[in-house]
């Protein structure tokens, strides 16, 4: 499985997931008005969102 770890003007960066990590995730955490910290990567289980964030998981490549 290959997951996106970042997006920028230059394109996307990806990572090959380790054995046992069969899901990709994208997590947003609100830092301020219209300002979010976004993290992406591989995971074994979908992480939980905190009160200021949102998480989306999938089990497909990129």
Swiss-Prot record:
The keyword Disulfide bond applies. Disulfide bonds join 3-24, 17-42, 46-57. CDD domains: TFP_snake_toxin. Expressed by the venom gland. It is found in: Secreted. PROSITE patterns: SNAKE_TOXIN. This protein shows a synergetic toxic effect in that it enhances the toxicity of other toxins. Heterodimer of C8S2 chain 1 and chain 2 (AC P01411); disulfide-linked. Belongs to the three-finger toxin family. Short-chain subfamily. Aminergic toxin sub-subfamily. This is Synergistic-type venom protein C8S2, chain 1.
């Amino acid at each position: 499985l290959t997951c996106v770890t970042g997006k920028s003007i230059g394109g996307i960066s990806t990572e090959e997931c380790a054995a046992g990590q069969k899901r990709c995730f994208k997590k947003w955490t609100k830092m301020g008005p219209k300002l979010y910290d976004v993290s992406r990567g591989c995971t074994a289980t979908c992480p939980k969102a905190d009160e200021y964030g949102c998480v989306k998981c999938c089990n497909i490549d990129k």
